[in-house]
């Protein structure tokens, strides 16, 4: 449990420190976006100073990301505030487990031995060791509760967590316990919402906050550019499928006359894309080219100026969505978080779902049918989604301010705005 210092050093007019916590210390594109969005929007009116916290201190600024401090340091820096808002914002954080989080931070050579450790020494012992190693006061790395964080208001910003009910009883119980022990929960897709309904956890359904990234990094394609098709696949999903993918992409490029941009989106262990995409480049030759810097703005530019995105990355698809580019969820039955998000929020005529053997046919059909009317409809839907995300952020700050001024019980739904928190 984190001890607190009585009293407050806060003075009227001072900025209040807010902690944004997530997996921002590894190169996984989507996680890095959450920190940027929260800092941009929460600091906009001058009331808050956002501390970007993760499992450990890191500096991925060479990739366009925000540096992080360890959560332990962020808690130490905010102890003298009477109340501190701690926002958990990041992807599938509800089901992230210690072996994955610690594995991502380790050298590639020991990633898989770390992943196997809970099965060798037992999950309960591995949790104890992980808590001691990271000083994170929770049995799960990204699911925090207020019982072990007195004086903090823990809130969850449009997070994900599919298949909670299939987790081991020890993990399942920890998720339920901590989510019922926080101020506010919002989730980003119907699958996660259904899982929390089973647990009896009150929550709101809100789009992924990364849809706001186009407000922060506006993009305009050059009129002279013919456009391209973005393709992405993670190493895990590419195994034994490279040749079949190459055949599909060759056919797609030949039929459309468009080149294929093979885009690296993640470089962290467990999220690395370089190896399968390099192999595809070798097979596709002049029909394709690599975009592999890993820099956030290069990734955004590549997707925003494309004609179509096809891949296994959820935040590749969300980036396409927010710039009104049609999306194809690759391997939808395997990448549930991706297919679930698109099914929850995106108009059917603006997205597609494809197994490997369906890539060329699905992409060609979507490119043919996606015209100006469909683009206008998608842009309108994106604006509605952005409004819901902004309302969610405003609701969280309102809950915090209510608690700091009146110490009244917080409620889950924003007064007068409940319609903003239902999927279309």
Each model region followed by its residue ranges:
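Active-site anion-handling motifs in enzyme catalytic cores
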Residues: 2-424
